[in-house]
């Protein structure tokens, strides 16, 4: 009987020691996978921003408070007459796991809305996107297959436009960082610019008692029309909705409607090489000028590195019209940007959004839940199993040695 007990203790103790070593070195790393039931909601508090009202522009009706301005009277009202300044805007994003999701991949669907707080649904909607991306559960990175899609609807900026992009291959992270985030740059995919570029690690901070990594990214002005057109044409066909969406990204008005005067008038007209057919009539004092919409953003994210959960975020988003890349870059310079913010003449959308307290708390709770699991499996359980396994192993060995001595003594007699 003692032989059986000692053998069992040795086997059990050895197994516990092996498991204690294997948990933090093999099992936990292998277990760092995204869950299949991801659900999260993040958003901003109401924040003042600027917005070009496409419906008001189409109707030629200035927004409230600008009706009596000199530039907002008569036939050729300036674009500035249709831009709301200091309008309360709010953003919200709901992310959840969808099919296909299995042991290897999880598909995330993120529905994001930007709306104005002074109107009731559905007239309050500025824009909405539904973004779908499939991630490798082990690496937390997008899969290499062309399975990502993006649906865009922006009634405030284009009442008739709704575009569907994809399927396409998604480069870069977006809603989740790797579990075990490093202090380095990562490629981050921007759904507006439709491309990935580095988001840089800038330092370590603390949030709600936990270590977080801070990442920053500045997307310099990028023209939206060419990239979106390329994506929409990927399937070889442009729908009427696609064409309408693209049309809103390049607007053509007389120079005076854009507020362009003097020497800038000819420069703006020439920049697009706007050739006229012989016999066409044109207003030499205010020629037709086509401007294209550009997008720039300053993005800041805070990430809990062990879980890869994004626990806080800020995005300073600005869309505006410019004649070319050079002018767009000049408009984005601090002094010119501030001037445009104070007196918007070319702005399509500006919102300096930051996550609200509820979003930060909810995401940190998710990170802490993940940390608790990692700590339990990687530290707590091994610390219990290790000493206990060693104790059982020693007891078993001692019992075995005593039994053998007793047997030798009995044989000697």
Curated annotation (Swiss-Prot):
This is Porin PorA. Its main location: secreted. GO terms for cellular component: extracellular region. Residues 265-288 are annotated as: Disordered. The gene is porA. Forms water-filled channels that favor the permeation of cations. Keywords: Cell wall, Ion transport, Secreted, Signal, Transport. It is found in: Secreted, Cell wall. Belongs to the PorA family. The keyword Iron does not apply. Pfam families: PorA (PF11271). One of its GO terms (biological process) is monoatomic ion transport. It comes from the Bacteria. Residues 1-22 form the signal peptide.
